[in-house]
Amino acid sequence: MNNARPLSRGVHHLALNTDDMKMTLDFYVGVLGMPLVHALKVPPGLGTGPGNRGNPPFENLRHYFLDAGGDTLLAFFEMPKGVKPKGDRDCIGNMQHVSFAVSEQRFSQVRKNLEKANLSYLGPINVGCDTWSMYFYDPNGIRLEFSHQGEAEPCVVERWRQTRAEALQELTTLNGELASWAQSSR
């Protein structure tokens, strides 16, 4: 729609919560095949002390990082059991799902791994722009999506980029006047 340069080079990491790190690692490493690349405990003072920089408000939490591909990490904090309720992914401010771009071969392998582990999934579904997806939940109740674009090299942004006219057709359904960024000819 416009030629603005991206703000960043991509996602560094997503940080999610679990109350069972072993169960989480068994799923992400064993079923999905994401390598564990870093394991640490949050240093004292960074959970409840003055040095807290936004970490969960507990001390000595495990904080593990997995290689999600594309130079992106998927991280988990292990929360104390029973301290916090599970969230509702459809609430405002909560994450609805995480989608990973994978090769067609990897897509098929994960599908087989889910079946072997007796885990249900929805798909494959053609979600548009020559992209096929499957949806499933991790053991923490986090909804995941794996998407592939056939044998082609993944080019997610280019494949999903609309023309200005296509985007404006939807944007005009928003209440009120279009924001200046939507009206610009860039």
Locate predicted features.
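Core segments of cupin and vicinal oxygen chelate
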Residues: 17-73
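A short, polar/proline- and glycine-enriched secondary-structure boundary/capping micro-motif
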Residues: 85-89, 155-158
